[in-house]
């Protein structure tokens, strides 16, 4: 029976037929690998996700974590699943062999982890955050910090978090007030409160390594005065042994709409709940130089943003497959025009409107998965391309695509979940089926790791204008290369290319128009519409790339025919949505800017 988590055939098509990851084994970093080792890793990920993560997805949602004032309790299946995950070695799939990693291509590693996000996004959040934490310290930490904290995280003994937001500041990191007081021994004592910290407390691991943004006294105001600190839940000795509890206290759990299996916490640092060394203050260790914390944390945040897009895609994908399976099995009604009321009912997939909803989901989730894996492939290019120019190009293109890869799947794969519920009808609105939970879980993704609005400001206000517009030029030129290949291919690909070309031209024209007079308030007033429109253009590009990867001689194969039809749908129904959005942007509409608070 086909999996209802992800489509392995789609993953194989994207990785091998389109992205050609097997060619990466010609590069020194991946020379020990082969198509077989890539497939073995995907097989392992699918098996462990199916057997260890998926079975308790509903149970973790119904029995969310509890806190009795002393301990956080989760259902035991979460720990068992995470232990199984640690045994696979997949946490380190993309990391260097020198730190115990499998050194797989990032595209393969991303595909592997998507299985776990589709199976149980809440349980998979713990290793997701831990890996981001470890990657940041590998990039910015000292050798001693790597030995003390990273290696236990990669072994599955320690878990990690990132602590940015504070109750009064939210996403406005310039306004954080947590302070870090320097000590004579070179450590710091931290005092403050952090809010919305996923995985902030639990008993799933021996220790929790918090990465905390704070200010050293006398630091410059705003984001330029933020430093980054390692603050472990339990202090670690020079020999790696665990010592006293640090002065980090769980003040409470947040009770959420979805993602309920992941603890979400309010943490208090330095309130005297514990007294390491006989006094209050959470012991912290500075990462790198003072006042570089935000730049360092963005290393983790950019990784997390692409990971959020992958998680949103996975939730949309599994919801699509489950609604597809239901539509094939659920008999109801008869074809339009049927005259015999005694005729047998047909499966609801026979009804055109149900097929419309399924086709919309397919176009969203398969387009989003292509984008996520394309970005992972860019990371491989950034790290291993032989030419410096190719590495720099991959880095810039990935920078431009990051806010889109975070936000487009978070919006449109959530729409896919909404359609999955609709396909099931009343049954989809009940807890008897998974699709309502997938919607609730996915609703977080347009919010965390930078809201939709923040990503829109990042795309239009920074990524498209940086380096004198080099990001915009590279994106449109890269799409233009695909368009040219499609024109040369002829047939339907050429026709789709013509439609995409006209829309890409509007991206360039509208971007220049918005910044024509340098007024940031007016330029950014409708940034969310810009993000959505450019996101649709990028997904149309992903679909054109997939069409070009389909072999013409296999046009009759149902998988290939389905891909072509989904591409047609996206170009016919979705891409035209960008027209009114670009019209709004081109007019530099002031409606939202001119609205006054007292008019509401």
What do the PLM-derived regions correspond to, one by one?
Residues 1-125, 148, 584, 590-600:
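Amphipathic, small/basic residue-rich leader segments at the start of a protein or domain
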Residues 2-5, 259, 374, 396-474, ...:
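Alpha-helix capping/hinge segments and adjacent helical runs
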Residues 466, 481-600:
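C-terminal amphipathic alpha-helical interaction region
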Residues 131-133, 142-145, 149, 448-451, ...:
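A structural-propensity feature for long, helix-poor, extended segments
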Residues 187, 191-245:
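A short core secondary-structure module
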Residues 65, 126-130, 141-183, 376-395, ...:
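Internal maturation/activation junctions in enzymes
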Residues 366-405, 511-525, 546-558:
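C-terminal helix-coil-helix/basic helical segment that borders enzyme active sites and/or dimer interfaces
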């Amino acid at each position: 029976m086909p999996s209802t988590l992800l489509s392995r055939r789609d993953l194989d098509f994207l990785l091998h037929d389109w992205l050609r990851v097997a060619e990466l084994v010609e590069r020194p970093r991946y020379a020990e690998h082969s198509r077989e080792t890539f497939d073995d890793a995907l097989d392992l990920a699918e098996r462990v996700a199916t057997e260890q993560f998926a079975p308790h997805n509903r149970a973790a949602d119904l029995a969310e974590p509890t806190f009795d004032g002393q301990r956080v309790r989760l259902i035991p299946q979460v720990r068992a699943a995470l232990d199984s995950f640690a045994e696979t070695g997949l946490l380190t799939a993309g990391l260097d062999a020198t730190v115990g990693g499998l050194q797989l291509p990032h595209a393969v590693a991303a595909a592997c982890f998507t299985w776990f996000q589709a199976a149980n996004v809440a349980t998979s959040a713990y290793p997701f955050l831990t890996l981001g934490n470890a990657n940041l310290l590998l990039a910015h930490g000292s050798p001693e910090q790597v030995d003390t904290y990273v290696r236990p995280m990669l072994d599955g003994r320690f878990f990690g978090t990132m602590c940015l937001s504070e109750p009064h500041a939210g996403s406005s990191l310039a306004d954080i007030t947590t302070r870090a007081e320097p000590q004579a021994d070179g450590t710091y004592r931290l005092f403050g409160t952090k809010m919305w910290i996923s995985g902030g407390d639990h008993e799933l691991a021996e220790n929790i390594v918090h990465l905390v943004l704070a200010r050293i006294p006398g630091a410059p105001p705003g984001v330029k005065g933020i430093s980054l600190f390692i603050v472990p839940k339990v202090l670690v000795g020079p020999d790696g042994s665990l010592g006293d509890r640090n002065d980090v206290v769980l003040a409470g759990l947040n009770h959420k709409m979805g993602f309920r299996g992941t603890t979400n916490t309010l943490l208090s640092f330095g309130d005297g709940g514990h007294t390491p060394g006989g006094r209050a203050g959470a012991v912290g260790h500075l990462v790198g130089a003072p006042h570089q914390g935000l730049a360092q944390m963005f290393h983790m945040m950019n990784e997390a943003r692409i990971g959020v897009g992958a998680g949103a895609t996975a939730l949309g994908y599994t919801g699509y497959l489950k609604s597809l399976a239901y539509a094939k099995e659920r008999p109801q009604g008869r074809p339009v025009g049927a005259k015999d009321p005694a005729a047998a009912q047909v499966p609801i997939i026979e009804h055109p409107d149900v097929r419309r909803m399924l086709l919309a989901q397919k176009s969203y989730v398969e387009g989003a998965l292509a984008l996520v894996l394309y970005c992972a492939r860019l990371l491989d290019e950034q790290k291993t391309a032989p030419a410096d120019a190719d590495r720099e190009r991959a880095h810039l293109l990935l920078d431009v695509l990051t806010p889109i890869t975070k936000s487009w799947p978070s919006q449109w794969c959530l729409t896919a979940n909404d359609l999955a519920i609709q396909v099931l009808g009343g049954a989809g609105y009940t807890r008897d089926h998974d699709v309502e939970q997938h919607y609730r879980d996915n609703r977080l993704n347009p919010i965390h790791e930078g809201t939709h609005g923040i990503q829109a400001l990042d795309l239009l206000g920074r990524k498209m204008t940086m380096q004198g517009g080099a990001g915009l030029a590279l994106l449109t030129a890269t799409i233009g290369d695909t368009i040219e290949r499609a024109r040369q291919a002829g047939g339907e690909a050429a026709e789709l290319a013509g439609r995409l070309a006209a829309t890409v031209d509007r991206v360039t024209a509208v971007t220049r128009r918005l910044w024509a007079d340098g007024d940031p308030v007016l330029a950014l007033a409708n940034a969310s519409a810009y993000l959505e429109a450019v996101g649709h253009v990028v997904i149309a590009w992903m679909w054109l790339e997939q069409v070009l990867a389909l072999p013409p001689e296999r046009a009759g194969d149902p998988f290939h025919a389905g891909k072509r039809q989904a591409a047609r749908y996206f170009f016919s129904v979705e891409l035209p949505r960008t027209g009114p959005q670009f019209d709004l942007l081109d007019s530099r509409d002031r409606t939202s800017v001119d609205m006054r608070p007292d008019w509401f």
